[in-house]
């Protein structure tokens, strides 16, 4: 979950990772889904790794984001690093196990969202890798959601329970206005965990960046969950 307002950007995730192999669903694992690289927070959902092709989304993202000077540059660099390796991995999965591919990756392959600051203000950029195309999004945008004074919302990862409860992004926007970005993000992740326990599970991890005129840009963990380490 990524939520942006003019004064605050929040990333929130669950920790459950579902695995599969040879057509069989394997026991779920727990993992941190928010990482840091330099002055950026970033979160990934979708295919994290694929051993037969050596695909590792976290390693590729870290290498791309580390040298970036802006959030949008970080997202563009991550796209260039991830996309060819991801296409190779998904082609191999589809060849080896077409049923697993259809069940897990027919609509969305992977999404990455990055949060940071520019001129002291929170900025977010994302890439959603879909079969046949990649969608680029950024908050604030030139117009529409995420424009000045508006709210930017992106649901990535499991979302069926959220969609069933709220129906559209405008309803989620009203929740953000009522509760604030952090409380709304937590409520939405909790809703997804309760609604799809076979696919989503705690603990929750949350990070945010607020408008603060300091060198850190107001970057902080709200709740680490399984995300250990500095900051």
State the predicted function of each range.
Residues 1-231:
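N-terminal nucleophile
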């Amino acid at each position: 979950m990524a939520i942006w307002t003019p004064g605050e950007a929040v990333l929130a995730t669950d920790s459950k990772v579902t695995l599969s192999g040879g057509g069989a669903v394997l026991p779920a694992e727990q993992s941190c889904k928010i990482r840091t690289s330099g002055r950026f927070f970033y979160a990934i959902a979708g295919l994290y790794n694929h051993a037969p092709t050596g695909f590792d989304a976290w390693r590729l993202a870290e290498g791309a984001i580390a040298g970036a000077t802006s959030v949008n540059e970080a997202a563009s660099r991550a796209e260039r690093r991830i996309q060819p390796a991801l296409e190779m991995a998904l082609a191999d999965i589809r060849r080896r196990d077409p049923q697993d591919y259809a069940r897990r990756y027919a609509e969305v392959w992977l999404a990455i969202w990055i949060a940071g600051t520019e001129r002291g203000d929170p900025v977010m950029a994302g890439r959603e890798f879909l079969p046949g195309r990649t969608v680029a999004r950024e908050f604030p945008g030139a117009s529409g959601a995420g424009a000045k004074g508006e709210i930017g919302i992106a649901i990535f990862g499991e979302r069926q329970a959220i969609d069933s409860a709220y129906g559209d992004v405008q309803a989620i926007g009203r929740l953000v206005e009522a509760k604030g970005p952090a409380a709304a993000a937590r409520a939405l992740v909790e809703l997804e965990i309760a609604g799809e326990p076979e696919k989503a599970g705690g603990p929750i991890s949350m990070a945010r960046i607020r408008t603060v005129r300091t060198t850190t840009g107001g970057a902080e963990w709200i709740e680490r969950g399984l995300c250990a380490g500095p900051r």
